[in-house]
Amino acid sequence: MAAPQSRPRRGELILLCALLGTLWEIGRGQIRYSVPEETDKGSFVGNISKDLGLDPRKLAKHGVRIVSRGRTQLFALNPRSGSLITAGRIDREELCAQSPRCLININTLVEDKGKLFGVEIEIIDINDNNPKFQVEDLEVKINEIAVPGARYPLPEAVDPDVGVNSLQSYQLSPNHHFSLDVQTGDNGAINPELVLERALDREEEAAHHLVLTASDGGKPPRSSTVRIHVTVLDTNDNAPVFPHPIYRVKVLENMPPGTRLLTVTASDPDEGINGKVAYKFRKINEKQTPLFQLNENTGEISIAKSLDYEECSFYEMEIQAEDVGALLGRTKLLISVEDVNDNRPEVIITSLFSPVLENSLPGTVIAFLSVHDQDSGKNGQVVCYTRDNLPFKLEKSIGNYYRLVTRKYLDRENVSIYNITVMASDLGTPPLSTETQIALHVADINDNPPTFPHASYSAYILENNLRGASIFSLTAHDPDSQENAQVTYSVTEDTLQGAPLSSYISINSDTGVLYALQSFDYEQIRDLQLLVTASDSGDPPLSSNMSLSLFVLDQNDNAPEILYPALPTDGSTGVELAPRSAERGYLVTKVVAVDRDSGQNAWLSYRLLKASEPGLFSVGLHTGEVRTARALLDRDALKQSLVVAVQDHGQPPLSATVTLTVAVADSIPEVLTELGSLKPSVDPNDSSLTLYLVVAVAAISCVFLAFVAVLLGLRLRRWHKSRLLQDSGGRLVGVPASHFVGVEEVQAFLQTYSQEVSLTADSRKSHLIFPQPNYADMLISQEGCEKNDSLLTSVDFHEYKNEADHGQQAPPNTDWRFSQAQRPGTSGSQNGDDTGTWPNNQFDTEMLQAMILASASEAADGSSTLGGGAGTMGLSARYGPQFTLQHVPDYRQNVYIPGSNATLTNAAGKRDGKAPAGGNGNKKKSGKKEKK
């Protein structure tokens, strides 16, 4: 019972000593522990968290872990208690063999501090191995002539334990002839020898049986036995003898197998068979047996297997020479293995912190490396460095450890993965090196906004597009990765024509494709300005803007619109008047059209599709002016029908047509007379209605002439000013601008003289419109003349049958305004497609007004005529406010004055010195009327 109680106390004493030793070593700067071998897994070794000054509960947070160079992890860290424990069963003999002290060095890594702490653990031997003989039965041959005191070596027992637990003693079973003597060698080994105490007599006893016991000093002690059979031989009194008791050999570790080391020779003075010697290894362990080979006949020793200095650098063995008489001779062989640089340095990545943020500070630890070379001396000295010009460097840590740190800031957009080559080279000759690749990933941060290739774009879309049609595709590039590079697109909200921009355009937030939500109309919207924003999904998100100009392209989707002549509302066709005295190139009327399209789609051309009298009229290709292609003849019909087409230049082209009816007559009464001379159908209702219309027209004409006479009387005091202008030959003297009104008022004045004869080509209805003149207030801006409202009287005429229904020509649409190029051209005195121009300065305006005043004043002269000659105010077609002075209707030559056989002629004819052409024509026609 005493032995079991003493063992726990001794264990406690050992742990106490180990703890005191640990504290002492900590004070010296290194942590040391000790632990007995063969302890169970998880056995306590030491409180490393306390020794490092760390809180056991925060070990995981600090990243504390055990690192060691060996492949087998012997120790582990208890994360709860912070204690160093065994990771498994530890066999001291396997780790350190026969070394007096078994020390295991490990390292403790504190990752958050980037530090390594060395820990030295001593494995304490326990008596867990029995002394063991290599054989269980041993045969010893002794010659009978052996003298007392002769010694015979016995096999040694091997105990892997050390200290007191190792082999301590041998015991021999009791007998009368032999005793046991134990010798202690230079290395501390004990060698048993069998000593002959009494002379042998083979004839008395030929064999002896002994038992040899080997015991260690453990508690309790362990032992093993071997049986010894002693055979007494006949006389052979000389044993083999080696010339040297010890042989020493040095050999390089890279010597190939079969290399001869040396040859040993033992001499035996006996003759014959008793002098023949056989050689063999006597003391050799299991590891040495396959490495060396001994020729038993010659004594030659050679290498049987490649040597390795790193495994074992020194070998000790005994060579035994034995003759046939069982006489033995012994010698020792000591082999020293010399190191050669045959091992490359080994680099082990202990810890790698990947990925690393691209904004990490310089000096950030990337990895811990362990470098080791199994060679010795300079062959085992290693230098470590990195290849290429990379932003990393190696720093020396404790022992053979290095840490890889950054030298500067990283940029993932330039390099996202670094292949770091770590070179480890020894100092041997020649030096050996090792390359180790470390793949380091750089983690992205959101440091780049999305960017467009261009700051602005222009896109085009045809009008009348389909809803949902794709317009344009935008792409922004973000050099970041993952969510930092996920780009979303948006359009900044705005208003367009009072509506939100999002009702016209939408953008796919993922692809950046723009879509049209509405069908665009070029005539309403011609361009849109968009601000597109590209944002990434980082935290915080980054964005950039780009301006997009979206232009709507015109299509030929609008046909030309005819503004003049305006289409009547009753279905009738307006009648344009042309005097029979008109020469070639006389401007009859002008077709005015516009196209709401633009560009080529709005270029208009005019052409004559159909005419009742081919070759009589022509239409200007670009102006739309209807002119006489030749002089009018008496044989030409009174009513001419023209169909004019207006066509744009789109693809395909669109067109519109208008039908014009031209009445060929020198005066309005002549028109009425000739219209009345047509044979209408007999209808009593139509005849009475025609009579009423004729009377109404005559009455209105009289009132109009009376109003003109009164107006001319009021303007008589300015007559001398007008005559001065005429006598100067067309050159105007300075007339104050304040006496005249602008161009728009001149147009209004011209409108007061508008006369429209609407003759329906396809019906028997027509009506003649006489506007009441109101030019007094139009021309005088400073005089207090009374302003008269214009009176418009409409009279219908029946051509063939009297019908109850009648219509009135609608005036032109006043909503439209003409540009300078769209205004009607000059009078019939001009030829071709030339267009007239509006007065563009004050002098031209005053001159125009003076001519109007002069013409009006000449009407008061009874001897003067108002015939429509060239350059006079001849009768033109449908005069609106857009016509120039040359289109003012010459109402004087078309009005018959009762009680006088003279007709009013244009005073301009007198000034020009020309005979009034229109006057002669009127006289002839008057004669015809008298005959009728």
Swiss-Prot record:
The keyword Signal applies. Keywords: Calcium, Cell adhesion, Cell membrane, Glycoprotein, Membrane, Repeat, Signal, Transmembrane, Transmembrane helix. It holds the Pfam family Cadherin_C_2. GO terms for cellular component: plasma membrane. Residues 810-841 have a biased composition (Polar residues). Residues 30-692 are extracellular. It is a single-pass type I membrane protein. Potential calcium-dependent cell-adhesion protein. May be involved in the establishment and maintenance of specific neuronal connections in the brain. This is Protocadherin gamma-A8. It comes from Homo sapiens. The gene is PCDHGA8.
